[in-house]
Design a protein with these regions (language model features):
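Core segments of small alpha/beta cavity-forming domains
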Residues: 1-51, 129, 143-148
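Long, contiguous hydrophobic alpha-helical segments, chiefly transmembrane helices and signal peptides
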Residues: 1-12, 23-24, 72-76, 101-107, ...
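Amphipathic, alpha-helical segments enriched in basic
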Residues: 7, 47, 82, 117-120
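Short, well-ordered helical secondary-structure segments
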Residues: 11, 45, 59, 92-94, ...
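Generic detector of short, locally flexible boundary/turn motifs and exposed helical patches
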Residues: 22, 34-41, 68-74, 93-94, ...
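Surface-exposed, charged secondary-structure patches
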Residues: 41-86
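Short beta-strand edge/turn micro-motifs at domain boundaries
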Residues: 69-71, 85-169
């Protein structure tokens, strides 16, 4: 989860989270993409730097409605600011002030699925639109033809990220 958090923040700054699609539900991925599109429409970039995951604590495991659910809490440290793409001037936040964030994530997978360490986190399939090979967990966008492929999640996906606490130093 620590690695995924860092990848997510780096993708956010790069305004490209497509490589993270297999790790999110379609609803959460779409919500995050819309947020990034809002920054792009305003001509802004939300920059996240000095990323560190300080702690990951499992809070619980549940089975409901045919799904397994894991609830971890992540404590992180970042710097977070927004720049105008044209002028590179900071419009919100600070390059210097560190934010200590606490999040709770919801991770889901179908009950009965088992994580196979040898096969990794995704499944290799063929794009129905153009025949290209794709690695998919819950969904993926073909980089060749743009087709979005959805299937039942084969492994854990993040369905929600809740900000619990924020402290700026």
């Amino acid at each position: 989860m620590s690695n995924l958090y860092v990848q997510m923040q780096n993708g956010w700054t790069a305004k490209n989270i497509e490589s993270l699609r297999p790790y999110f539900t379609d609803a959460l991925f779409t919500q995050m993409e819309r947020s990034l599109q809002g920054y792009a429409q305003r001509g802004e970039t939300n920059v996240v730097e000095r990323i560190a995951v300080l702690d990951v604590t499992p809070l619980g495991f549940h089975q409901t409605g045919g799904e397994d659910q894991i609830l971890p809490r992540l404590r992180t440290r970042i710097t977070d600011y927004t720049v105008n793409d044209g002028t590179q001037q900071i419009v919100r936040g600070s390059r210097d002030q560190e934010k200590f964030m606490t999040y709770e994530w919801d991770l889901l997978r179908p009950t009965g699925m088992q994580t196979n360490a040898e096969s990794g986190e995704t499944k290799r399939i063929t794009c129905p639109g153009c025949g290209a090979p794709l690695d998919v967990n819950a969904s993926a966008r073909c980089p060749y033809c743009g087709t979005v492929i959805q299937q039942q999640a084969q492994d854990w996906v993040i369905s929600a990220i809740r900000g619990i606490k924020q402290q700026t130093l």
